[in-house]
């Protein structure tokens, strides 16, 4: 298996895994604690030696690979809403990587969260609120806001809002890694078959 393509597909799966949780939270107001932790933990791995260092929860990653097959494959599983969120995240990532001040602020704020984890779990409400505020303060202001659709009763709850923003930050982290590994939007069209084949092979590992 082409290692660069494997790593790039892993990062793309990470984006989709976080976005799918945003969609579920917005509709149902609930999240799977293990999946949430898996996505949020990716934010904190800022100097990985490999993509695998970022995605250590293999069960969560497998869900991401399945989403890659659903979104890029020819099946009826394609989800237009997830595609819309993906396009929004990739657009914001382009703006972030062009903003030196934004990247510096992001690094400093993530360091603060790492210090907070000496006392709290990654899924503690205080940590999630902190991650959400990083997204609001740094990412949201970069460009058009991503409009989240869902159940208004769920979306009104502060904890749901915080989790959604924290997961969008996780999606952004994976998008940054995907781009660093050579990912480009045109690959999602012209290299679709190679990405699908890599995701299928990765599901069997």
From Swiss-Prot:
What is the scientific name of the source organism?
Answer: Shewanella sp. (strain MR-4)
Which family does the record claim for this protein? Belongs to the HflD family.
Transmembrane feature ranges:
none
**Compartmental location:** Cytoplasm; Cell inner membrane
GO CC, alphabetical: cytoplasm; plasma membrane
Taxonomically, the superkingdom here is Bacteria
User: In the record, what lineage is assigned to the organism producing the protein?
Assistant: Bacteria, Pseudomonadati, Pseudomonadota, Gammaproteobacteria, Alteromonadales
Could you tell me the keywords of this UniProt record?
Cell inner membrane, Cell membrane, Cytoplasm, Membrane
Concerning PANTHER family, the annotation shows: HIGH FREQUENCY LYSOGENIZATION PROTEIN HFLD (PTHR38100:SF1)
Asked whether the UniProt record includes NADP among its keywords, one would answer no
Recorded topology in the membrane: Peripheral membrane protein
Which InterPro entries does the record cross-reference, listed alphabetically? HflD, HflD-like_sf
Q: What is this protein called?
A: High frequency lysogenization protein HflD homolog
């Amino acid at each position: 298996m082409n290692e660069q393509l494997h790593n790039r597909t892993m990062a793309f799966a990470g984006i989709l895994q976080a976005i799918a949780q945003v969609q579920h939270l917005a509709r149902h107001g609930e999240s799977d604690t293990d999946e949430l932790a898996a996505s949020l933990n990716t934010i904190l791995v800022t100097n990985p030696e490999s993509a695998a260092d970022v995605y250590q929860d293999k069960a969560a990653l497998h869900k991401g690979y399945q989403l890659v097959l659903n979104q890029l494959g020819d099946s009826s599983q394609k989800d237009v809403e997830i595609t819309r969120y993906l396009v929004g995240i990739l657009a914001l990532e382009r703006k972030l990587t062009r903003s030196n001040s934004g990247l510096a602020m992001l690094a400093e704020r993530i360091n603060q969260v790492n210090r907070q984890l000496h006392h709290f779990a990654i899924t503690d409400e205080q940590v999630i609120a902190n991650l959400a505020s990083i997204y609001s303060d740094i990412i949201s202001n970069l460009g058009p806001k991503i409009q989240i659709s869902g159940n208004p009763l769920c979306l009104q709850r502060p904890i749901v809002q915080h989790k959604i923003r924290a997961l969008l930050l996780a999606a952004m982290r994976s998008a940054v890694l995907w781009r660093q590994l050579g990912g480009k939007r045109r690959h999602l069209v012209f290299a679709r078959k190679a990405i699908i084949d890599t995701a299928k092979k990765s599901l069997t590992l």
